[in-house]
Amino acid sequence: MNNYLPTDYQSFIHTSRYARWIEDEGRRESWPETVDRFISQVVTAKTDSDTKVQNELRDAILSLEVMPSMRAMMTAGPALHRDNTCAYNCSYLPVDDPKSFDEAMFILLCGTGVGFSVERQFVSKLPEVPELFESDTTIVVKDSKEGWAKALRQVIALLY
């Protein structure tokens, strides 16, 4: 498939999961371009101007000696810059507050998995939900991750 990765399978995984589409050129990123995007977004921010460290990491990733978080490789760029939640594979939260629900929704919309606990010591902290609920309230949902999570928070807040 290409000359950058040792097997066609690795090339397929890179192209189908991690390579961004470059609209101007009508193609997907090559493996070195994906690595460079990750280095410029994640590594450069943490190593300041230490180009020796950046180059060592770049070479190690390109040669598959080390592998960074593939979620960070996939999301490096505007999405990761906006909110680093998308860089994580999974997260956890106890369901002990009504805000747990919209927080879980936001995290899931960022592409991160959410593990949760509904053990008695947690859910006993939640307020009781009324059996019947009537409301004329209209909730306007902004079509974004933040907007949907906020709307869920508003719906749940109406219950208490």
Describe the predicted segments one by one.
Residues M1-Y160:
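Extended catalytic cores of very large enzyme megasubunits
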